[in-house]
Amino acid sequence: MIRELVKPEHQLFNHRIDSCSYRLDRQFLANTLVENMIHYNGIGLSANQIGIWERAFVMVRDLEHSEILVCFNPRIIKSYAEEVEMEEGCLSYPDLFLKVKRPDRIVVKYEDVDKKTHKVKLSGLASRVFQHEYDHMEGIDFTQRT
């Protein structure tokens, strides 16, 4: 089901979401996130961007192989010191692109749709997308990172 993108001034945009409540079926939420990310031509989308108050997001991990991750209760457990500045965009801010400095490599934990916990190292674009979507869960948008 395609949902309307929440405007940045909406309350869901500015508040931290503590954890996934499991009120929604995980498979339904995962499918909704993937469907909306593809519909809006994104490489990442957080649940609160489409009006769902859950700590979850979807992201493209590998553009070349179209590998998609759906992350529930994501956490960044380690950030490496080397930072890289790149231009970022956000589906919630159409046509706005800003230079944002972020760690190039991170270690993260998240749960998948089956509640299995994963611990992975991400670098490059995958690291950046994870951090951008993670920020949405923390009530931070990319305009605050410039």
Give each language-model segment a name.
Residues 1-146:
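Positively charged
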